[in-house]
């Protein structure tokens, strides 16, 4: 069986030979900005031209937002759906490209569009399903919130329950992150529906706990390291170093995102016997 270290090394070589794997993430970034336009439109609808903002007090601002609550709700809902749709299409596209690169050594933009169109709807529904599964953990916060006095005042029993709820929610979210780690990869690689992809991810984790945990920790460590570098640079007083924070963002889009997609795709394909060079048979 291919070790995680070998998987990371071979995945890196595949990414190095297919630098076009960053294209889905570039398109996703650009279109995600456009998807925020409904919120910008709601802002201008509520407050008018930017030059009028200096004359608006915080009380007036809150009153205007309350008066346009339906507009803001519709704008946030529309933007959320657009962002989810963009993410779903290009996540499927990126995984499709990664799978083709792992199988044949070369991925093309045609693979990107084909995978995105084929798996868009299932990926969109899977994103909503997994999102609700994570949000369901907020039930741990309800007892503490219910006991908080109105108006808000620190109350030991309520604060204790709230802190306990936050800890439980974090543990729940962490568990779900591991259990659902390969949902998009199972969905695209095995051409599954959203529910079957969730069950496949849970089953995959049961048989590959250590590998999933190690790769998850590696990806999180690299991501946090990159964010810490960007944060440290942004907090610096020397203005000449400010562009470096933008460089870390580009590294995330151009390098880290496609590279981790190759790693996760290779892990799923190798452990389910879909890579000819892995020597692994389907454990199920």
Label each residue range with its predicted role.
Residues 1-23, 106-115, 283-284:
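N-terminal juxtamembrane cytosolic/stromal segments of multi-pass membrane proteins
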Residues 12-27, 117-128, 206-217:
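Membrane-interface helix starts
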Residues 72, 76, 107-135, 157-170:
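Alpha-helical membrane-spanning segments of integral membrane proteins, especially the hydrophobic core
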Residues 144-167, 232-247:
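Membrane-interfacial helix-loop-helix connectors in multipass membrane proteins
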Residues 22-23, 73-78, 123-125, 163-168, ...:
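Hydrophobic alpha-helical transmembrane segments
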């Amino acid at each position: 069986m291919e070790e995680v270290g070998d998987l990371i090394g071979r995945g890196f070589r595949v990414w190095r030979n297919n630098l076009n794997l960053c294209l889905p993430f570039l398109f996703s970034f650009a279109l995600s900005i456009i998807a925020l336009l409904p919120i910008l439109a709601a802002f201008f609808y509520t407050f008018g031209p930017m030059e009028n903002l200096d004359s608006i007090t915080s009380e007036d601002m809150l009153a205007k937002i309350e008066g346009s609550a339906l507009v803001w709700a519709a704008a946030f809902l529309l933007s959320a759906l657009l962002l989810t749709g963009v993410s779903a299409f290009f996540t499927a596209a990126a995984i499709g490209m990664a799978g083709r690169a792992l199988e044949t050594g070369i991925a093309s933009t045609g693979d990107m569009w084909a995978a995105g169109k084929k798996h868009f709807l299932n990926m969109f529904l899977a994103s909503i399903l997994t999102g609700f599964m994570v949000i369901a953990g907020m039930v741990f916060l309800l007892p503490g919130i219910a006991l908080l006095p109105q108006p808000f005042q620190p109350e030991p029993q309520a604060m204790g329950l709230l802190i306990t709820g936050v800890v439980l929610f974090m543990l729940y979210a962490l568990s779900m992150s591991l259990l659902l780690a390969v949902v998009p990869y199972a969905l695209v690689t095995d051409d599954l529906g959203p529910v079957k992809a969730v069950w496949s991810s849970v089953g995959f984790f049961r048989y590959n706990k250590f590998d999933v945990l190690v790769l998850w920790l590696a990806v999180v460590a690299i991501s946090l390291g990159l964010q810490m570098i960007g944060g440290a640079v942004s907090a610096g007083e020397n203005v000449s170093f400010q562009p470096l924070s933008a460089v870390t963002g580009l590294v995330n889009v151009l390098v880290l995102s496609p590279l981790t997609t190759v790693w996760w795709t290779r892990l799923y394909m190798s452990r389910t016997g879909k890579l000819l060079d892995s020597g692994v048979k389907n454990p199920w």
